[in-house]
Amino acid sequence: MDLGIAGKRAVVCASSKGLGLGCAEALAAAGVHLVMNARGAEALDASAEAIRAAYGVEVTTVAADVTTQTGQAALIEAAGEADILVNNAGGPPPGMWTDWDREDFMAALDANMLTPIALIKALVPGMMERKWGRVVNITSQSVKAPIAVLGLSNAARTGLTGYVAGTSRQVAGSGVTMNNLLPGIHATDRANALDGGVVKAQGITLDEARARRAATIPAGRYGTREEFGAACAFLCSQHAGFIVGQNILLDGGATLATI
């Protein structure tokens, strides 16, 4: 399927690896020029060069922490007249409710709520003026069904979801769509970290931890960055103009919900 977005310009946050990289690769395959961001320059530059070689698109890199004002300013400057924004950030660490204080919550809110909102406020007005734009926020399946040990993530990502629910309806009339992708377990560093915690807590091997988690997923496996990226690219396409303010689960059926 031709997604109809060749020549567009996309900002993809946290895109040196994992789900962000999957989104960047899928957009590049559709002919979209990229502004890629991550904190570490080495991995970011390597991923960007691989995408340039594979797809022949323009790729600008911004190695910066976008939870800071300096990092946000650098990314916004590089974005130019961006048509697409993919918000993404690593989740806060797991723990128990007794572990977290105000500083922990503020760090989670900065990364998983306030930074995406800042980038939306900076880039969406230009999209509205040009009468076309796409915003995809990568959140979590915990928005639909909270995960007890991920209380910081539950809170911050649900806050972003509430913001998007209202804002998406305000900008849709200008040709800008805004939606959220809610990943379940995918084969990423984040999954490795969570599985590693199970290994330590239960005294089992990593393979056993992964097998047990996969058994809780009706699809019987972890998701891949490639299939996640394909879903993101479709939401950014010309074909997705009537999808507004939605929370789309990509979890292999793991979340038990009717709606």
For the regions a protein language model found, what residue spans apply to each?
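Conserved glycine-rich cofactor-binding loop
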Residues: 9, 14-18
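Conserved glycine-rich Rossmann-like NAD(P)H-binding loop of the short-chain dehydrogenase/reductase
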Residues: 32-46
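Substrate-binding pocket helix/loop in short-chain dehydrogenase/reductase
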Residues: 96-109, 135, 213-214
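Catalytic loop of short-chain dehydrogenase/reductase
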Residues: 136-159, 164-173, 185-186
